Amino acid sequence: MLRLKPALLALLFALGGAAAAADVRVAIVSRTVFYVPLWLAQDKGYLNEEGLRATIEIFDNAEKINADLRSGRSQIAISTPESVVIDAYRGGSLRIIAANAERLPHFIIAKPQIKTLQQLRGARFGVLSLNEGTTYLVHRLAGAIGLKPGDYEVIAVGGAPTRWKLLQEGKIDAGLQPFPLSYEAEAAGFTNFGPISRYVSDYLFTSVNVDSKWAQENRPVVQAFLRALKRGQSEMAARPGEAALIAARELKTAPALAERALADTARLKILSPDLSVSDAALGSTFETVLGVGLLPPGSVYARGRMVDSSYLVP
């Protein structure tokens, strides 16, 4: 990607027009309800109006997203925050610049033969990655219901759509599924043990992430992206029926299920309302990463090491 001096880029954005357009590749993990504001920002032209030509790429792999941020192949990611926290505490350049999902929309879904939580002993849990997201939630769930690490298996298979496919094929026994996939699973006869939020309340599950070296050189681009994302989220709240049609298209589900998912997203306050990162959500994620030994022993929560909120402006 062409790197323009910040002062020149700011001038171009101020002047507007086609000359100001900047190419931005946005990496996301999977097709889940968290990304509806982004899809709306693209579909409604908010990204274009901010002077951005955005390409959205679905990776189904958080580690590859981080590698692409470092290499510059992707400029912005809406992805899992755990590896960003780890990278920051190791002196790396990845940073969280805004929040996305700060509460969990996942339900504990198991194959129909599993009827009780105790029957999850010996189960194969499908997760996105062994070092991200649902992995840590599975461990916290297991501990809460009395299972030890050797009592179950965690397998990295990919995002929620992939997990649903593997559940149906019998290749995994259980997984944490966000809505609307949780609705589809329950309708298909799979066991729904309820929301993971019974065991984990606030948790920064997805965030807007960048390589700080690139972001510092392209501040107007980053700020423009966040403004467009905010507009997409406002659009989702203001016109849920229309947003549900776009959600249904992108999530590859029925419009009625998409509308239900958006209603539940609002009711459960899944998304950060203003994209700001709350200490309650980030702190829970930090404590989880620390607890599984991926940070140096004795590491202390320091928001400024992980988060740069300076890009999030009105």
Question: Locations of the language-model features?
Answer:
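N-terminal secretory signal peptides that target proteins for export/translocation
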Residues: 1-3
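Bacterial N-terminal signal peptides
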Residues: 5-16
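Sec/Tat signal peptide C-region and signal peptidase I cleavage site
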Residues: 17-21
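Short, glycine-/small- and polar/acidic-enriched structural segments
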Residues: 23-150, 154-169, 173-179, 192-196, ...
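Extracytoplasmic/secreted envelope proteins and their assembly/folding machinery
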Residues: 35, 44, 66, 81, ...
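Pocket-lining segment of extracytoplasmic ligand-binding domains
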Residues: 82-83, 161-251
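Secondary-structure end/capping motifs
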Residues: 217-296
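Conserved C-terminal helix/tail region of periplasmic/extracytoplasmic solute-binding proteins
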Residues: 287-314
